[in-house]
Amino acid sequence: MMDGSITRKVTSTLSNQLATWKWKLQLSLLERKLATINNDYFLLQWELLFITNEVMKWKEMIAFLESQLFCTTQNFVAQETHDRETFQSLVDDYNKQLSENNLIISVLKSRPQLSSFPIYLSDEVCSHLKFVIAELNSLIIVFFISLVFLWVSIEV
């Protein structure tokens, strides 16, 4: 009679211990997945901040270019050599910034998906990132068109 009672106690203790180990293992796996999700989210937020900063640089360059274009069209009798030097420095800035942004965009577009399981926050940041990259591309085009207008106004 004692043997059956001891067996039941040992069996229930072992099954409780196994259940505890199973929950601990699942908890550690969930904690690892959560850490990966948080890491991916913060990485995406950093990339979004970085690209937004690039967009702001382009907006500043476009504003400067528009002011140069306005000054050139207002002052018909301006020193041509100074205008040409300013224009050449603008072209150099444009080429430098464009090459940097092309590299950044190609790295961001070709990078693999960060986590294998989707999460709403990461999807939201990814959509913001795609929007900012599209805005950056359009700003590059606007800057190039403004640069052409400035070149035409200097030459004429």
UniProtKB/Swiss-Prot annotation:
It is found in: Endoplasmic reticulum membrane; Nucleus membrane. GO terms for biological process: homologous chromosome pairing at meiosis; meiotic chromosome segregation; meiotic telomere clustering; regulation of reciprocal meiotic recombination; sporulation resulting in formation of a cellular spore. It is a single-pass membrane protein. The chain crosses the membrane at residues 131-151. GO terms for molecular function: cytoskeleton-nuclear membrane anchor activity. Coiled coil: none annotated. GO terms for cellular component: chromosome, telomeric region; endoplasmic reticulum membrane; meiotic nuclear membrane microtubule tethering complex; nuclear outer membrane. Keywords: Chromosome partition, Endoplasmic reticulum, Meiosis, Membrane, Nucleus, Sporulation, Transmembrane, Transmembrane helix. Involved in chromosome segregation during meiosis. Involved in meiotic telomere clustering (bouquet formation) and telomere-led rapid prophase movements. Interacts with MPS3. This is Chromosome segregation in meiosis protein 4. It comes from Saccharomyces cerevisiae (strain ATCC 204508 / S288c) (Baker's yeast). The gene is CSM4.
